[in-house]
């Protein structure tokens, strides 16, 4: 019994020891918690608020922890207010800076565009000035060239006029000096006076002959230089240029026109000089009349040089068009003849093996090749370019055809009995047959 009572006492003592003892700090915390609960319940029950007791207000105001929390919240609010104020102050500043940046960009763009416009205007003005200068130079060069040609043509005329004008004066002086000797005996004139009167006219004739010889030599030199340049150009251009025996015919025609005019003027002056030779029994009237005729002829020739410029240009354009057409036709015929040559060469290669067995066939083929005229369009072109007569060659400004082509002579001798139309038809038919054979061979090769 005693042991049971002791155990019960020990258990009660242990429970008493285990129970917490309320300290004054714990009591203050419990009061603060109760007050906080009342405040929370007051805030949550706003439609029907529960009033907070005055004791709770006093306990919360006296608690340091609550004061520190409230101070911290106030600091946060103040910081938020400061941040909002700074943002509000920065907004107009940012707007102002943006406007300034936009204005600066617009001004820079305008300045750049103005600079570009100035540069382009300067470049255009420089280009226009250069173009004007080039056009002026071209016009000056053309005027110089145009002025040099009539000057070159008129210089010998002026010289001849001066000489012709000097000659009558000398003749008049000679007549005046020798007039008393002729008056008593006009039927038997003095031989010395005749020699003196003939000497100026002979000097004029000699000068005219010398000038004509110099001009002929210059023309020959120019023609030789032109022929040498044409040969060099033909060698550079290759075999196709060989089909054109006169590649610079238009240039020769232009040159020939001026040369023919110069020849006409020279002939007029020569005839005038020959007529200016006074026979023994003529007087001053014939000299004056001849001088007037010479002046009229030279003036008409110089006018014709200037008036005929437009007609010459038109004729030159027509000649160029005709020459271009003939050149195109020659190219076409040259292609056809080249094909014919290739075909004949292939036939010859194929028929080399058969020639030993059948010599008559080789003879026939050679005769047909000669008859069909597979020699290229050189002779045809030469026929087309050859002037029809001596007058045409003189009008075109070309020298008269002195040397003939030996190939043309042989062809004319060999084909004297044949008509040209029959030969052309035969050659065309042969070319067509050969082309058909080549086409069949190509088709067979493609199929094979």
Curated annotation (Swiss-Prot):
Principal location class: cytoplasm
Where does the record place the modification Methionine sulfoxide?
Answer: 363
Provide the glycosylation site positions. 415
Where on the chain is Glycine amide found, per UniProt? 308
Q: Name one GO biological process term.
A: negative regulation of catecholamine secretion
Question: Which cellular component appears as one GO term in the record?
Answer: secretory granule
Stretches of Acidic residues bias are at: 223-238
Answer yes or no on keyword Methyltransferase. no
Q: Which domain of life is it from?
A: Eukaryota
Q: Does the keyword Amino-acid biosynthesis apply?
A: no
The note filed under miscellaneous reads: Binds calcium with a low-affinity.
* Assembly: Self-interacts; self-assembly is promoted in vitro by chondroitin sulfate attachment which occurs at mildly acidic pH conditions. Interacts with SCG3. Interacts with ITPR1 in the secretory granules.
Spell out the protein name for this chain: Chromogranin-A
Species this chain originates from: Equus caballus (Horse)
Q: Gene name, please?
A: CHGA
